[in-house]
Amino acid sequence: MELIRKSNWSCAYRDGDEFVKQLNFWVPEAAEREAKASDTAYGYGILTPKYISTEIVPDVSLCLRYEYLPIKKLSNEDVLSDSKLLSQVIELLDKLSEIKWDNSDTYWDSFLVKEFDYEFSFLNFNTQKYSDFIHSLIPSVFIHGDCSIYNMGLLDNNLVIFDFQHGSLGPEGWDKAYFMATINRNAISNYCLSDREKRMAEIISAIRLGRAIKKNLKEIPIRREIYESWKSI
């Protein structure tokens, strides 16, 4: 198999006509969630690699198999230099929120909110208002949960989205706010966010900064800069 990318969470390979995502940790529920979310999105006409199967070696490894698509990588610079591409991203995120999902899904409250609070703890400023706001949000629509440009790409000029690891029931507007929170606010001339979504973008940029500090990522300076651009005066 050909290694495509590697992270702390997983390794991705190409195996002929298939894309293989091997989780580095034994978390069956995570594999199950990603498979279900990917398959559901695909069924709703979202352009995403088709889920094939999950290979399980008990207590050892989990491998999710998808069809391989020759996706062209994208960067934030690509989006900022192409207003049509930015519009395409927004349209895709709006379409994601229309996906029907299990209304009894508690992943937002049982995992994501707790993870956000933990990431706030790595920041050297008071984040209580951020935490209170996050806890006040009501999960009501399907969300991808990690909508950065690095989980998107182009296939024949059509936008592809993948890595539905956090696919779940979440707050309306979350995916759009998340995507915008990965970009310096000053670089976006038309970001089409409501006041509530702007508030979410500010908080998400703080979460992403805390996450970078937690993981000691090289992106800490740029994420700090992005947070400062979204921070309310």
Residue spans for each PLM region:
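An alpha-helical support segment within catalytic cores of ATP-dependent transferases
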Residues: 98-145, 150, 155
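Active-site Asp-x-Gly
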Residues: 141-142, 155-193
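Short beta-strand micro-motifs within the conserved protein kinase catalytic domain, predominantly
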Residues: 50-62
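The N-lobe alphaC helix and its flanking beta3-alphaC-beta4 segment of protein kinase-like domains
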Residues: 27-44
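Conserved kinase catalytic-core helix
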Residues: 44-45, 70-109, 125-134
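Helix-rich C-terminal or lid/interface subdomains of diverse kinases
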Residues: 29, 87, 178-233
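ATP-binding glycine-rich loop module of kinase domains
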Residues: 6-32
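Short pocket-lining segment of the protein kinase catalytic domain that shapes the ATP-binding cleft
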Residues: 38, 64-72
